């Protein structure tokens, strides 16, 4: 199993770091802002709805 051969440790650690860094960048730049905007718009709509019911 190549995962247990010490020769491959540096390679695995490097690619793991690259993949995690890439995923964090993609999530923070593209995916998460959409969810934040969606949440804020839903909150705003619910507050407007509450105001109109009074």
Swiss-Prot record:
Report the protein name in the record. Answer: ATP synthase protein 8
Q: What InterPro entries does UniProt report for this protein, alphabetically?
A: ATP_synth_su8_fun
Q: Which UniProt keywords apply?
A: ATP synthesis, CF(0), Hydrogen ion transport, Ion transport, Membrane, Mitochondrion, Transmembrane, Transmembrane helix, Transport
First and last residue of the signal peptide: none
GO MF, one term, reads:
proton transmembrane transporter activity
Subcellular location per the Swiss-Prot or TrEMBL entry? Mitochondrion membrane
The residue ranges crossing the membrane are: 13-32
Describe its membrane topology. Answer: Single-pass membrane protein
Q: Tell me how this protein assembles.
A: F-type ATPases have 2 components, CF(1) - the catalytic core - and CF(0) - the membrane proton channel.
Which biological processes are named by the entry's GO terms? proton motive force-driven ATP synthesis
This chain's function reads: Mitochondrial membrane ATP synthase (F(1)F(0) ATP synthase or Complex V) produces ATP from ADP in the presence of a proton gradient across the membrane which is generated by electron transport complexes of the respiratory chain. F-type ATPases consist of two structural domains, F(1) - containing the extramembraneous catalytic core and F(0) - containing the membrane proton channel, linked together by a central stalk and a peripheral stalk. During catalysis, ATP synthesis in the catalytic domain of F(1) is coupled via a rotary mechanism of the central stalk subunits to proton translocation.
Question: What's the superkingdom here?
Answer: Eukaryota
Q: Please report the organism this UniProt entry assigns to the protein.
A: Neurospora crassa (strain ATCC 24698 / 74-OR23-1A / CBS 708.71 / DSM 1257 / FGSC 987)
Q: Which family does it belong to?
A: Belongs to the ATPase protein 8 family.
Cellular component terms, GO, for this chain's entry? mitochondrial membrane; proton-transporting ATP synthase complex
């Amino acid at each position: 199993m190549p995962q247990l051969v010490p020769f491959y440790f540096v390679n695995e650690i490097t690619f793991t770091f690259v993949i995690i860094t890439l995923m964090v960048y993609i999530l923070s730049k593209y995916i998460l802002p959409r969810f934040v905007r969606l949440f804020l718009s839903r909150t705003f709509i619910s507050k407007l709805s509450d105001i109109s019911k009074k």
